[in-house]
Amino acid sequence: MLTRRIIPCLDVKAGRVVKGISFLNHRDAGDPVQLAAFYNESGADELVFYDITASSDERNIMVEVVENVARQVFIPLTVGGGIRTVDDMYRMLRAGADKVSINTAAVLNPQLIEDGAKRFGSQCIVLSMDARRINEPGQPSQWNVFTHTGRDPRPTGLDAIEWAKRVVDLGAGELVINSMDADGTGAGYDNELLSAISQQVGVPVIASGGAGKPEHLLAALHEGKADAVLAASIFHFGTYTVEAVKEYLANQGIPMRRTPRPV
């Protein structure tokens, strides 16, 4: 059985790692290079960086962050936020990223997924999706995709499950499924959404949005059928360590990559 992955998520704003609730009310969580090095030593399986401002004036800061992080860590690094063209992908990969994550740009231009996969390989292309429940209580579950998440989230009218299937057909090699309803709440992932998508696609699905305790990660891997779990606040602010979470999951029968202890 393949090992499951624990992936700290670092949202970067103006060169600092921040974390908010439902994309707002950000708290400073530290220096991205220092945090990345810490997680590398702590047994994280991968790291994800999102440039949450994603404006042109921040782009050079993010490239510099990626370059500095790539010198410090020896685990896969995914970078997203403001990647709108194949040239943007190339710039981040050249800076040291192993994968690039696209979200809004893929909705606006789905061809970007196919173009990126053809040039760099599907293993480099991660599709990140922000989804929100739209069904009324008592009705069948349904989720729609949103873009420009933050202060001005915009509904796309795209069904989350159908969008997931389409982007995989276009060449996305992994999916990050973020629940807008759960993001930053610490109340657990939307496992129904994760399971619905996991059963429809043949690529790894990464759970995002809602981690508050190790039991939530376990539920995402079991009930949500996720291949990996993304988490931020529980790690950034010292609530739990990566090592402690991996030990808990391993004790629950989840196959994990264990970090060798120094002799």
Curated annotation (Swiss-Prot):
<dbReference type="GO" id="GO:0016829">
    <property type="term" value="F:lyase activity"/>
</dbReference>
<dbReference type="GO" id="GO:0005737">
    <property type="term" value="C:cytoplasm"/>
</dbReference>
<feature type="active site">
    <location>
        <position position="11"/>
    </location>
</feature>
<dbReference type="InterPro" id="IPR050064">
    <property type="entry name" value="IGPS_HisA/HisF"/>
</dbReference>
<dbReference type="InterPro" id="IPR004651">
    <property type="entry name" value="HisF"/>
</dbReference>
<comment type="function">
    <text>IGPS catalyzes the conversion of PRFAR and glutamine to IGP, AICAR and glutamate. The HisF subunit catalyzes the cyclization activity that produces IGP and AICAR from PRFAR using the ammonia provided by the HisH subunit.</text>
</comment>
<dbReference type="Pfam" id="PF00977">
    <property type="entry name" value="His_biosynth"/>
</dbReference>
<dbReference type="GO" id="GO:0000107">
    <property type="term" value="F:imidazoleglycerol-phosphate synthase activity"/>
</dbReference>
<dbReference type="GO" id="GO:0000105">
    <property type="term" value="P:L-histidine biosynthetic process"/>
</dbReference>
<dbReference type="InterPro" id="IPR013785">
    <property type="entry name" value="Aldolase_TIM"/>
</dbReference>
<keyword id="KW-0456">Lyase</keyword>
<dbReference type="InterPro" id="IPR011060">
    <property type="entry name" value="RibuloseP-bd_barrel"/>
</dbReference>
<keyword id="KW-0028">Amino-acid biosynthesis</keyword>
<comment type="subunit">
    <text>Heterodimer of HisH and HisF.</text>
</comment>
<comment type="pathway">
    <text>Amino-acid biosynthesis; L-histidine biosynthesis; L-histidine from 5-phospho-alpha-D-ribose 1-diphosphate: step 5/9.</text>
</comment>
<feature type="active site">
    <location>
        <position position="130"/>
    </location>
</feature>
<comment type="similarity">
    <text>Belongs to the HisA/HisF family.</text>
</comment>
<keyword id="KW-0963">Cytoplasm</keyword>
<protein>
    <recommendedName>
        <fullName>Imidazole glycerol phosphate synthase subunit HisF</fullName>
        <ecNumber>4.3.2.10</ecNumber>
    </recommendedName>
</protein>
<keyword id="KW-0368">Histidine biosynthesis</keyword>
<dbReference type="InterPro" id="IPR006062">
    <property type="entry name" value="His_biosynth"/>
</dbReference>
